[in-house]
Amino acid sequence: SDLSAWLTEFSLVRNIGFAALFVFLTVLIISAGVEQGIEKWSSRLMPSLFILMIALIIYVLTQDGAMEGLRHYLVPDFSQITSPKLIVSAMGQAFFSMSLGVGTMLVYGSYIREDENLPVVGALVTLTDTSVAFLAGLLVLPAIFVAQNLGVTIYSDSGSLIAGPDLIFQVLPALFEGMGVAGLFVGFAFFILMSIAAVTSSISMLEVPVSYAVEAHKVNRNKATWLIGLIVFAISSAICLNFDTLFGFVITMTTERAQPLLSMMVCIFAGWVFYRNTILQELKSGNPNVEHGMFWKIWPVYVKFFCPALILLTFAQGF
């Protein structure tokens, strides 16, 4: 139909239209504040994301070709473990997935209660994020090989698996189309899943500049949210207008370049500039015995020396 063609084929009007809708939804959530906006919607969206993802994984794993994808995902190729490009890509993915280096964790961390055990909270956030990423792999990689079983091309000219926008907007839609009637429901559920994941990420990203404007410059939250939202939409529109040139470039520069470097600067600030005793007193408010535990014996040295050195070394090897 004309609607399905409009949704699946590349269209500038569609891209800018959905960008506007997406920014509008994000602005509505952020303008409502922390409790009525971020907390309320995150508590609704995250369980929905888990349920949808698990349901899709179960369905995809029952399809022909899924086991080949599962082997491709879970059986490691140790010959590539020292590849600088792979390490930089993995580091970029980790920084992007955890929203490190962009202020999100700092802002969200400032909203939790003072009596929270920060090392435990940090570990739980990392565990949850890694679990979601692992589940996403259990869905996407088997789905790619199910698509191959249906006659869809899944390898690029270079011999690597198709990834990025081409995977989402070409390979997977072709898979859903090949599934017949079931593909309509699976495809709809998959893109709802993608939208939920994107919204939960975008609200955390937008909260950073909004929080700064509200706290540092005393700007009204509603005004700050709409103003910054308009700036984000303008940048998004510029990327849509020059999609082939800018999209991959922006992804590479932000996740593989800017975020690791910014995270290294955060490590330097936390390890060398910020008073160690101030950090310890903050940690003690949630865990009075933290000073005598393994965390405090390792963390200061790790952040001060190892993290910046490893990030810089890995970053340098990527060139």
What function would you assign to each model-found segment?
Residues 1, 50-74, 146, 239, ...:
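Hydrophobic alpha-helical segments and their helix-loop junctions in multi-pass secondary transporters
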Residues 1-35, 67-88, 162-169, 182, ...:
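Inter-helical loop and helix-membrane interface segments of multi-pass membrane transporters/permeases
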Residues 16, 128-134, 184-187, 196-199, ...:
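Loop-to-transmembrane helix boundary motifs in multi-pass membrane proteins
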Residues 17-59, 255:
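Membrane-interface loop-to-helix entry segments
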Residues 21-28, 88-99, 189-200, 254, ...:
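Hydrophobic alpha-helical transmembrane segments of multi-pass membrane proteins
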Residues 39, 43-199, 223-224:
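Membrane-embedded translocation segments of transport machinery
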Residues 195-205, 225-236, 254-283:
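Hydrophobic alpha-helical segments of multi-pass membrane transport proteins
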Residues 245-270, 292-319:
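A generic transmembrane alpha-helix motif of multi-pass inner-membrane proteins
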